[in-house]
């Protein structure tokens, strides 16, 4: 069981969300080009804080603080995608200004930049996905369906240095990228292969050998993906699958190593003309005691929970009534973070599911932090050419906490 303990209002539409790998920190990228980083309270701070002052959250009786660590207008266009480095020290952002910027996660100070190669006509080839594969390798996908590999050890130059490799795994832009865990024989422990979705196909690319394969046409746009291991192994199955979210509300399961075609389908959202798009996927931490489970953020604003093995939806909650969910994940403390529209919500296990008092937390206003990077003024709402499945802006978000329970699992 989860309840929402905090709602963070944003100054513009959310285009990207990233969660720190080892600290309770989240970063957001906005349509205006702003990047903002928040620190969430730890479990210990939540339990012992006596601070009852007003906060930016909608939590009625929350304790503790959500602090704005820094805020800046990082890109002159929109900020399309964000990712933390492997160790969490760096935050990489990419925008429609044709730049990737590497900044210190703690302070927001930019330490390196990458110029994205332009399109054939000389225009900006805007980014769609950025992912730090290892401390040395950054993956960057663009609107033109290119997938660039950069060596992070190369310093910034005003003369655009070419990427170390460029691949084209799909005919359409890369909509999601999921690294595959390193093999047991790996000496570095870092991923060397990854799965991408783009258009109606899935592809697997190797760091050294390039694109290894591309699936058959799935006759449906593939939107999101995630990896889950530790499933029941039987026959040729190793218990490792990549789960892919489609534009019509269907999850498809792909056995690792058998990439030609999907082997299972799960209907998450049904509708007369097809279900809502599954915009983002994440694995629910097993520490929460719910078994193997996937959380899916939908274009309708709902978050649905799918129990693997049962292969069915066991519960759902609502992030927003009008805006779709484009960011979803869990921080190191077990908080679920959902983002979409102009709000980010932070959730935790409800009191009756963990046998303790209800915990909550609030935060400080983000309006007092000065921008620290490329600009110190608020621009008008940035426009973006990305083919995004966006809905009209929501109007009233002043709602109380929502509660979600897992049917037959408590």
UniProtKB/Swiss-Prot annotation:
Alphabetized UniProt keyword annotations: Nucleus, Repeat, WD repeat
Record InterPro entries: WD40/YVTN_repeat-like_dom_sf (IPR015943), WD40_repeat_dom_sf (IPR036322), WDR55_POC1 (IPR050505)
UniProt feature, compositional bias: Basic and acidic residues: 377-386
Main location: nucleus
Disordered: annotated span: 41-65, 354-410
Localization: Nucleus, Nucleolus
Bias-annotated ranges (Acidic residues): 43-53, 364-376
Recorded GO CC terms: nucleolus
Keyword Secreted: no
Mapped WD repeat ranges: 9-48, 74-113, 119-160, 223-264, 273-316, 320-357
Family: Belongs to the WD repeat WDR55 family.
Name this protein carries in UniProt: WD repeat-containing protein jip5
Organism: Emericella nidulans (strain FGSC A4 / ATCC 38163 / CBS 112.46 / NRRL 194 / M139)
Gene: jip5
């Amino acid at each position: 069981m989860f309840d929402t303990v905090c709602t963070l209002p944003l100054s513009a539409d959310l285009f990207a969300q990233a969660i720190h790998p080892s600290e309770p920190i989240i970063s957001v990228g906005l349509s205006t080009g702003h990047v903002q980083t928040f620190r969430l309270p730890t479990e210990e701070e939540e339990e012992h804080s006596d601070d009852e002052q007003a906060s930016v959250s909608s939590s009625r009786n929350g304790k503790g603080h959500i602090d704005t660590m820094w805020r800046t207008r990082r890109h002159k266009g929109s900020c399309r995608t964000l990712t933390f480095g492997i160790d969490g020290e760096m935050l990489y952002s990419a925008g429609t200004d044709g730049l990737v910027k590497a900044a210190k996660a703690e302070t927001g100070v930019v330490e390196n930049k990458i110029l994205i190669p332009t399109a054939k006509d000389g225009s900006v080839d805007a980014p769609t996905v950025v992912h730090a594969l290892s401390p040395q390798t950054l993956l960057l996908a663009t609107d033109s369906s290119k997938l660039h590999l950069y060596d992070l050890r190369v310093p910034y130059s005003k003369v655009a240095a070419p990427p170390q490799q460029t691949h084209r795994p799909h005919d359409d832009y890369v909509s999601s990228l999921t690294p595959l865990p390193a093999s047991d024989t790996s000496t570095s422990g870092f991923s060397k292969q990854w799965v991408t979705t783009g258009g109606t196909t899935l592809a697997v690319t190797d760091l050294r050998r390039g694109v290894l394969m591309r699936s058959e046409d799935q006759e449906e746009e593939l939107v999101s993906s995630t990896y889950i291991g530790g499933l029941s192994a039987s026959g040729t199955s190793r218990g490792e699958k990549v789960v892919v979210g489609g534009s019509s509300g269907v999850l498809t399961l792909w056995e690792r190593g058998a990439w030609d075609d999907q082997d299972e389908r799960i209907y998450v959202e049904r509708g007369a003309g097809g279900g809502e798009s599954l915009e983002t996927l994440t694995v629910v931490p097993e520490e929460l005691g719910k078994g193997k489970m996937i959380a899916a953020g939908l274009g309708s604003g709902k978050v649905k929970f799918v129990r693997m093995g049962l292969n069915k939806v066991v519960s759902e909650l609502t992030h927003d009534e009008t805006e779709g969910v484009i960011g979803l994940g869990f921080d190191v403390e077990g908080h679920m973070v959902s983002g979409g529209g102009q709000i980010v919500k932070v959730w935790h296990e409800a009191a009756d599911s963990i046998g303790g008092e209800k915990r909550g937390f609030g935060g400080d206003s983000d309006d007092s932090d000065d921008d620290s990077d490329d600009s110190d003024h608020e621009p008008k709402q940035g426009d973006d050419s990305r083919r995004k499945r966006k809905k009209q802006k929501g109007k009233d978000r002043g709602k109380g906490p929502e509660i979600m329970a897992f049917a037959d699992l408590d």
